[in-house]
Amino acid sequence: MTKSELIANLVAQYPSLSVKSVDESVKEILEQIMGSLEQGERIEVRGFGSFSLHYRQPRVGRNPKTGESVKLDAKYVPHFKAGKELKERVDLA
């Protein structure tokens, strides 16, 4: 499901809400999540899951085109861990 499909589904489910208000709400929620991660914070949505940052050590990678070794710097990457309720609902599907 894309963001556009999510917005369309929400508008269909809640006809009293406008497309614009749903679109702005979804964008703001995503912006808050990204902003918190940018600040190094962990986000937890009970029953759904948590977003955090994982540290990746510097390493030597390989350019797949040339086979040349490339030094990759250390970095933080976003990580999502599904919550118990989400895992259970997916398992039943």
Swiss-Prot record:
It comes from the Bacteria. The keyword DNA-binding applies. GO terms for cellular component: chromosome; cytosol. One of its GO terms (biological process) is regulation of translation. Pfam families: Bac_DNA_binding. SMART domains: BHL. Keywords: DNA recombination, DNA-binding, Transcription, Transcription regulation, Translation regulation. Belongs to the bacterial histone-like protein family. GO terms for molecular function: DNA binding; structural constituent of chromatin. InterPro entries: Hist_DNA-bd, Histone-like_DNA-bd_CS, IHF-like_DNA-bd_dom_sf, IHF_beta. This protein is one of the two subunits of integration host factor, a specific DNA-binding protein that functions in genetic recombination as well as in transcriptional and translational control. Heterodimer of an alpha and a beta chain. CDD domains: IHF_B. The keyword Transcription applies. SUPFAM superfamilies: IHF-like DNA-binding proteins. This is Integration host factor subunit beta. HAMAP family: IHF_beta (MF_00381). Gene3D superfamilies: IHF-like DNA-binding proteins.
